[in-house]
A protein has these predicted regions:
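Non-catalytic alpha/beta scaffold blocks inside enzyme catalytic domains
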Residues: 1-166
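Short, intrinsically disordered, charge-balanced linker/junction segments flanking boundaries
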Residues: 174-177
């Protein structure tokens, strides 16, 4: 039997992610990356339950927050990576849980991001951060010749534009043979 709460029928809840990860059940967290997330604000009573453990680097050695705003949760972060706002970036928009229909909308930048720029001139943000991190870790599927199509043509994945183009292509070609 489980020693902590499990919610098998609940959609996408993170109420036990931090308490479980900080207590080591079922797995201990070694790093936490938050993206536009503020669980301490969004989950009632969570701060009182995990405050001391969240601030203890022996319990959670690394916290990185990618966010356009300072909030209650990223106040604990070792690093805060600036992110863009919705009018500055690419993205996919879908309804939250509980909507009985599948739907998806595309978003593209209409203004230049105000975030700091990397050495190559690109705005620092979630996509550029994760692409750079994946390349630094040597993960497959990023960089030059990252992705191949069925005919063997290779495509790069170095920018947010390429990130979202590949995602859009997967959606557009879903089910097509």
């Amino acid at each position: 039997p489980a020693t902590a709460p499990w919610f098998p029928n609940a959609p996408g809840l993170t109420t036990e992610l931090l308490p479980g990860g900080l207590s080591g059940y079922p797995y201990a967290l070694k790093a936490l990356i938050l993206w536009a997330a503020n669980p301490l604000y969004g989950i009632p009573g969570l701060r009182a339950r995990i405050d001391k453990n969240l601030a203890d680097p022996r319990k959670l050695p690394l916290i990185v927050s990618v966010d356009a705003f300072i909030n209650e949760s990223n106040a604990y972060a070792d690093y805060i990576v600036p992110d863009s706002l919705m009018y500055e970036s690419w993205g996919w928009v879908a309804p939250w849980n509980g909507v009985p229909t599948k739907a998806l909308g595309a978003r593209w930048p209409v203004i230049e991001p105000k975030a700091a720029k990397a050495a190559d001139g690109r705005a620092i943000g979630m996509e550029n951060f994760f692409i750079a991190l994946a390349k630094a870790m040597g993960l497959p599927g990023f960089g030059a010749d990252a992705i191949t199509d069925p005919e063997g043509n290779a495509y790069a994945l170095n920018t947010p534009e390429e990130w979202y183009l590949r995602g859009g292509a997967n959606i557009a070609w879903l089910g097509v043979t």
